[in-house]
């Protein structure tokens, strides 16, 4: 069966693993998923990201992060731009998630970046997801 939205599947695997308090979540690898996973790691939402090569497309392992008392670091993860309804923003209209407490992941001409980086470099693009 063909997957219509692999990014949504990747984010859903992370969201479900987070709700069930899994240590590791695995998903089929792609370039954009790797970039999203690296942003999650850089922003402190996950512990680590590992790429495992098999003879096909590879696998991304995301090591989820929890607080001292087991509280979730990721409160919510929401897909914004979908295959049926793409959401694009200009450089002036880059959104702030929860007034700056969350992070928007944006696919720009310079690559996949956070909302903060998009604002600093004055670029717009497709809003992939919100995370807080």
From Swiss-Prot:
GO CC terms of this entry: ribonucleoprotein complex; ribosome
Gene Ontology biological-process entries: translation
Disulfide bonds: none
Keywords on record: Ribonucleoprotein, Ribosomal protein, RNA-binding, rRNA-binding
Description of how the protein assembles with itself and partners: Part of the 30S ribosomal subunit. Contacts proteins S5 and S12.
Record's protein name: Small ribosomal subunit protein uS8
Function: One of the primary rRNA binding proteins, it binds directly to 16S rRNA central domain where it helps coordinate assembly of the platform of the 30S subunit.
Family matches, as Pfam families: Ribosomal_S8 (PF00410)
Superkingdom as given in the UniProt entry: Bacteria
């Amino acid at each position: 069966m063909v997957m219509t939205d692999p990014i949504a599947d990747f984010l859903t695997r992370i969201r479900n693993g987070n709700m069930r308090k899994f240590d590791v979540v695995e998903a089929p690898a792609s370039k954009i998923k790797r970039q999203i996973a690296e942003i999650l790691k850089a922003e402190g939402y996950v512990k680590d990201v590992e790429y495992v090569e098999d003879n096909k497309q590879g696998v991304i392992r995301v090591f989820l992060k929890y607080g001292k008392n087991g509280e979730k670091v990721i409160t919510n993860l929401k897909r914004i731009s979908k295959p049926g309804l793409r959401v694009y923003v200009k450089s002036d209209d880059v959104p702030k998630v929860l007034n700056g407490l969350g992070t928007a992941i944006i696919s720009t001409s310079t690559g996949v970046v956070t909302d903060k980086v998009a604002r600093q470099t004055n670029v717009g693009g497709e809003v992939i997801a919100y995370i807080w």
